[in-house]
Amino acid sequence: MDPFFLNTQHVELLVSGKQSSPQDLLGIVSESLNQDRIVLFRPGAETVFVELRGKIQQAESHHSGIFSLPVMKGISPQDYRVYHQNGLLAHDPYAFPLLWGEIDSFLFHEGTHQRIYERMGAIPCEIDGVPGVRFIVWAPHAQRVSVIGDFNGWHGLVNPLHKVSDQGVWELFVPGLTAGACYKWEMVTESGQVLIKSDPYGKFFGPPPWSVSVVIDDSYEWTDSEWLEERIKKTEGPMNIYEVHVGSWRWQEGQPLNYKELADQLALYCKQMHYTHVELLPVTEHPLNESWGYQTTGYYAPTSRYGSFEDLQYFIDTMHQHGIGVILDWVPGHFPIDSFAMSGFDGTPLYEYTRNPSPLHPHWHTYTFDYAKPEVCNFLLGSVLFWIDKMHVDGIRVDAVSSMLYLDYGRYAGEWVPNRYGGRENLDAIRFLQQFNTVIHEKYPGVLTFAEESTTFPKITVSVEEGGLGFDYKWNMGWMHDTLHYFEKDFPYRPYHQSDLTFPQWYAFSERFLLPFSHDEVVHGKRSLIGKMPGDAWRQFAQLRLLLGYQICQPGKKLLFMGGEFGQGREWSPGRELDWELLDISYHQGVHLCSQELNALYVQSPQLWQADHLPSSFRWVDFSDVRNGVVAYLRFADADAKKALLCVHHFGVGYFPHYLLPILPLESCDLLMNTDDTRFGGSGKGFREPEILTPEIARQEREAAGLIEADDESGPDCWGLDIELPPSATLIFSVTLQ
């Protein structure tokens, strides 16, 4: 009778590539009370040699690639190694214990495993004193999963994984492997189809279009402990974000700077320009350059386009050394259809949402995630925790939140299925986002979350305990749209669109807002910021300086996409660097200097950021001069403060040597910033010392200007402020109230 390991059914499954439990058949097996047997599977081999405690022995050859060697009882995995056909000597993968445990299984299938990035994928480790790589993957509908790579000739029968749970987790420890080893998954589906897949939990990948996963050794020595300890104290401070696409900020010798080259240059530039944070367009791995990173295939991997895993860690560490926070754009709303990645991962739509008639999102032709599956939510949650823990990022900006919240986003009637209450809200996505924010804020206080959300979905920045989603900030897309819509109007038409400026104040404090001028506004025919401005060159640059000043003064945190700070003329393209040579031209130099000084004023002025989410931080002065396009308001650090900033914006092209503003009683008024300064390329007007007028004098001035009739007694008289108002400019005054 053949020994059990030659059981025809077991061997047939192994040889045909459908064996889900190779660990039960291979490795060290007990044969009798006094003897064990080493059982090996080497498809295609004629002979196999084993080094057993220093002695080389030839294994017995059975049929179909099965070899065995009888050994004394109590042999351990460390006691023997096997010669491979390429001459290498390595320990037997099937002799080592499986480490995926019941707690791992419980947490993962519940969707709450907070260190899943240290369990799934390819994890270098040491088992029983033997170094190697442990491979674990979730593929519940596969008949067989193998790890293939340069270490086994990319042969799918050599290293099949063991199915460690009936819920589809597979595991194998491959001794002797080290960082740098390339691998993929080979799967046999329920229908018998063979699939080759990249690792969803892979920490690094070969350069596109080569989609191979790469084992990494995370051994970087961080030097930012002081930054991390102090990070929570910075959350209520100023936030002035510079949005950057790594591959097109600056080039050298015709190629983008890599992470390490970029680190010092960008950190120094941000310090010079008084930015507090950089926000990186996705640096998660992605196959298509033109997606800008927003079609992600490697949720746990920095893109290899700009350097290594460690290089990006160096970049973030360097930013922290210079006092600059790092925010990562992250895309949990959809993923690309590329067959090498997650789509149809184990032969079924494992990660995909399938309840709509078409699984593809109409906007991006991508798949949306199925948030009803705990394992999918754990995959996404693990991704963001990985970036915070292993890469030390300080904030996560969630892309396209609206597409997650609404089942009908981008779809017409009949193209979507309502939730169980008949509504259009994606209840599973809402629960995931609440879990996402809860876990991050509990586990990593001081790490901030941002929602790019373009609808009126309520309570985006309200705590989860109070029924909200729990984000720290929401991008104010309405403010951005209305502001740019106004600025694009030619000057004669602006009086008819004054509400574009005033309406956003009606909801400015309904959420904790961030005011963005992002990459999305300078592509696809929308023109650059300077290109949106009407008029001749002088007026365009004056308007851009005015716009930057307006953004700085408005309540909310700030974000500006790279190039806007010096008046980039062309639309942004990911395939070229910014037009830095424009800084040789005086107009662009002026905008650049103006932006620098506006940023400096912002970070030094608590009135502009300390309470910018509270109504008490903002008080209108005047927005009635629609014809001339003048608005003015006060900004306060707290409700009881006597010190305030008076912000005056003139959106027209006229010049007023004497312009009278109604104002609260003032003790003093000093000019801090004038975007019409000749140093910035302006006309140099607006520097006359402002005059504070008592109510009596202010009334006389208004009568003389024809603003009121002499016998008009409607309403109380107010104080006045007589200023010199330059064309198309922002003026910022420091005022002390009586």
UniProtKB/Swiss-Prot annotation:
Pfam families: Alpha-amylase, Alpha-amylase_C, CBM_48. Keywords: Carbohydrate metabolism, Glycogen biosynthesis, Glycogen metabolism, Glycosyltransferase, Transferase. The keyword Glycosyltransferase applies. SMART domains: Aamy. Gene3D superfamilies: Glycosidases (3.20.20.80), Golgi alpha-mannosidase II (2.60.40.1180), Immunoglobulins (2.60.40.10). The active site is at D399, E452. The keyword Transferase applies. It catalyses: Transfers a segment of a (1->4)-alpha-D-glucan chain to a primary hydroxy group in a similar glucan chain. Its EC number is 2.4.1.18. GO terms for biological process: glycogen biosynthetic process. GO terms for cellular component: cytoplasm; cytosol. GO terms for molecular function: 1,4-alpha-glucan branching enzyme activity; cation binding; hydrolase activity, hydrolyzing O-glycosyl compounds. Pathway: Glycan biosynthesis; glycogen biosynthesis. Monomer. HAMAP family: GlgB (MF_00685). Catalyzes the formation of the alpha-1,6-glucosidic linkages in glycogen by scission of a 1,4-alpha-linked oligosaccharide from growing alpha-1,4-glucan chains and the subsequent attachment of the oligosaccharide to the alpha-1,6 position. Belongs to the glycosyl hydrolase 13 family. GlgB subfamily. This is 1,4-alpha-glucan branching enzyme GlgB. The gene is glgB.
